Amino acid sequence: MRISSYFLYVTLFFLLLLPLGKAVAGWNSFIVNFDKSLYGKGAQTWKIAPYDDHWVYFANKNGMVQFDGNVWTVFPMNNFSDVRSVLASTTQKRIYAGGINEFGYYEPSEDGELVYHCMSDTLERDCRFVGNVWGIHEADNILYIQGDDRVVKYLNGKYTAIEMNAKIDCSNMVNGILYIGTDHGVWVLVGNTFFPLQGADILASNRIRGIIPHKGGGVIVVTAYNGLFYCNGRTTVPFVTGAEDFMCENEVFCVAAQDDKIALGTIHKGLLLIDCSTMDVKYFNENNGLRNNTVLSVAFDSRGNLWAGLDSGVDYVSLSSSFTNLYSYP
């Protein structure tokens, strides 16, 4: 039977000590470890998309994975490639997924089962080789599919491939504008043309890992080794958190933001959680409950709790729970 909220699931989980995972301490926040064997042994999870308080979708090595709070279900793509990205669209009532040279969407049939519809099969052959689809975004009835060196735009049944003369490492839709992070800095898409983000020249030599909105306008750009930067379209300045040395030493790989909180996943030392209202910093790693120190994806759910896709397995950090641990791991 589907559980209607993650909070209820996690609470029961802790109280009943279900054998599917284990709850351990992490700075007074419970962490639930989900082993990869629960969803077909696909190790890496590259993207996470919570949806409507009831489900979470994962871009996993084995396919698109659905979790309803109780049951894990794997949906492979037509070419059985790793799934790199997933987008839960509340407007279209679809789950978009991108793999390697393939993208499409899952939609409920009349009996409620998800059915896959491949979109990339309808592309002209020379546009079909998008490589790894690391990002899928939507705005103003336009769907954007980000590949290794191009973005495919889908509007009114028509595809437009927009090539970028650089490797695209990440992308995000912020206030209706598509930003991309490349090995040539940060760019924005205007119409069907990429333009460099004004005032952000100093980022051209950085490895860009993510771009998130800043509550005062502009964006925060996340780099792999050199911390965070605030860009307003005119100037770019460091966004100082006090965790710059940690980021430099452990290589930031992914980011998620919600309200005043920023979650950063690292390659070597787990999760970093920053509260921008107080600049308090918390760390979650193998020493205090995280299953694995290599974090490939992060996402907040609607309750403010945090999902982390690891190099092996998935973890759930219950940040909003009133339950706390009496003990911590060394």
Model regions: which residues?
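Carboxylate-rich, polar loop motifs that coordinate divalent cations or form catalytic acidic clusters
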Residues: 1-330
